[in-house]
Amino acid sequence: MQDPNVMPEKITSLLDSEGATDIDISGYAPMTGGYSRLMARFEAKFTIDGEQEEGTFVLRGDPPEGQAIIETDRSQEYAVLKSVAPHLNTPPARFLDSKGIHIGTPALILEFTEAESTLPWIEKNGISDLPLKLAELAGAMHTIPVDQLPSSLARPTSGDPLTDQIQMWKKTAIDHVEHLPIFRYVAAWLDKNRPPPVPVSLVHHDFSTANMLVDGEGDLVVIDFELATIGDPREDLGYFKAYAQAAPPDLIDENPDDFLSRYREITGFSEEQVNPLVMTYFLVLGVIGVVSQIANVGSAMAKGETSSTNIAFNLDNLLFGQAAWMAATDALEAALDGEVN
């Protein structure tokens, strides 16, 4: 995917297989910023279903075997993007090479968006009304009818998303190449302090400013659904807060009362189900999807089964995470014991 001399022909082959004609691909150039997948931007002209199209597109594909930081499925990501498109502000997915027959690796093509990365936008424009728009984005995502989502999305095997996530903490500790006692501690703490349940919904699992853009109208655009599952929607709120500790600002903390009030209004959740203490709980629980992937690939690297400098770099994130988990559990314990207001 990095060679601009061969990729236009491969993209042409994919579009041709989808029934497009009069195909012209130009301006192919790899993009930076992709965390787990290879990405490139290109210009395209083609005719499909009797309509002529011209625009900028993004190719998103798997890295070479043994170099992936996390393992995900382009076919499922494509299906999720198609299902959420009527409900969310996200770049439309257009074409899929599920087996890599044309591109050389499993890949999908999306429409390019001129929206700007969130953190640079905030540096230039300030926080503005992004906290409320974040609440509305999260609320819209978490109220998409589950029966409209792909059947391939993982559901809670135990019937309870919290039980599944707590079990993942335990399994990650067991499967790791080294002992991870803090993971066992976190699992026990999460089990002891469960909040009231809410209905399951789509969970993004990497819901952060890194996967959001701001468009020309100042609205949030959400991207990158490769880790999505069906689970407890509050996991996304906790993950957002956890990520913001490493990459501030925390838009939720700008005005938590207004954020939570708007989110509850959209979702219909009660104050008992969604409040600052519950978000602190999910700050810990909600990161395990990404944490387990990083820990697992770290084990594979230690065993000589995979190699990538990015893997070693991302293992350092686990050390930062451990400090955040301990701080969160200590703060919540104090609040539950009535030591703080």
Feature roles, as predicted:
Residues S13, S17, L38, A79-P86, ...:
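Residue-level signal for well-ordered alpha-helical scaffold segments within enzymatic catalytic domains
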Residues L251, V290-N341:
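ATP/Mg2+ or Mg2+-diphosphate-binding catalytic cores
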Residues T32, S36-A44, L59, A93, ...:
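Active-site acidic catalytic loop and adjacent metal/ATP-binding pocket
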Residues A29-S36, A40-D164, K171-I182:
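ATP-binding pocket architecture of kinase catalytic cores
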Residues R74, P131-L134, L162, I166, ...:
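Hydrophobic packing residues in well-ordered alpha-helices of helical domains and bundles
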Residues R234-S270, L285-G304:
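Active-site activation/catalytic loop segments of kinase-like enzymes and analogous catalytic loops
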Residues E271-L285:
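All-alpha amphipathic helical-bundle segments outside canonical DNA-binding/catalytic cores
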Residues V6-I23, T143-H205, G268-E271, A335-E339:
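An alpha-helical support segment within catalytic cores of ATP-dependent transferases
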